[in-house]
Amino acid sequence: MSMQDPIADMLTRIRNGQAASKVAVSMPSSKLKVAIAKVLKEEGYITGYSVAGDVKPELEIELKYFQGKPVVELIQRVSRPGLRIYKRTTDLPKVMGGLGVAIVSTSKGVMTDRAARKASMGGEIICYVA
């Protein structure tokens, strides 16, 4: 049986990996997952990521901790296969009053809510991270 929501699975693996104090988590790779991992690394929520394998590529995400506690406090799926959530530039949410980020899929690629606002672009709200 196929996976219904691979992005939710990715976020759950990150959440569970940090709850279990794992160094890294791995999952099947896709272009969207790699783009989300890139944004998480740029924002400082993960240490790094790598893609290995040709036939079935695996994405490995290195989790980040600060003084023994996970850096990611909140990672929550917003838009899902059964209910897509799209917002225009003026309606993009601020996560935790601007302390967190909303990851947005736009026509120019996957970016944070701040970058989307700066570029005057709306799009699909993939998830919240704080």
From Swiss-Prot:
Pfam family example for this protein? Ribosomal_S8
> Could you tell me the Gene Ontology terms of the biological process aspect for this record?
translation
- InterPro entries in the cross-refs: Ribosomal_uS8, Ribosomal_uS8_CS, Ribosomal_uS8_sf
| GO MF annotations in UniProt | rRNA binding; structural constituent of ribosome
| PROSITE patterns in UniProt | RIBOSOMAL_S8
Detail the disulphide connectivity of this chain as listed in its UniProt entry. Answer: none
Query: Which top-rank group of organisms is this from?
Result: Bacteria
SUPFAM superfamilies to which the protein is assigned, alphabetical: Ribosomal protein S8
Q: Which keywords describe this protein according to UniProt?
A: Ribonucleoprotein, Ribosomal protein, RNA-binding, rRNA-binding
Q: What are the GO cellular component annotations?
A: ribonucleoprotein complex; ribosome
Under the heading PANTHER family, the entry gives:
40S RIBOSOMAL PROTEIN S15A (PTHR11758)
Q: Which family does it belong to?
A: Belongs to the universal ribosomal protein uS8 family.
Tell me, what does this protein do in biology?
One of the primary rRNA binding proteins, it binds directly to 16S rRNA central domain where it helps coordinate assembly of the platform of the 30S subunit.
Q: Please give the subunit comment from the record.
A: Part of the 30S ribosomal subunit. Contacts proteins S5 and S12.
Which HAMAP family does the entry link to?
Answer: Ribosomal_uS8_B
Task: State what protein this is by name.
Answer: Small ribosomal subunit protein uS8
Q: Which gene encodes it?
A: rpsH
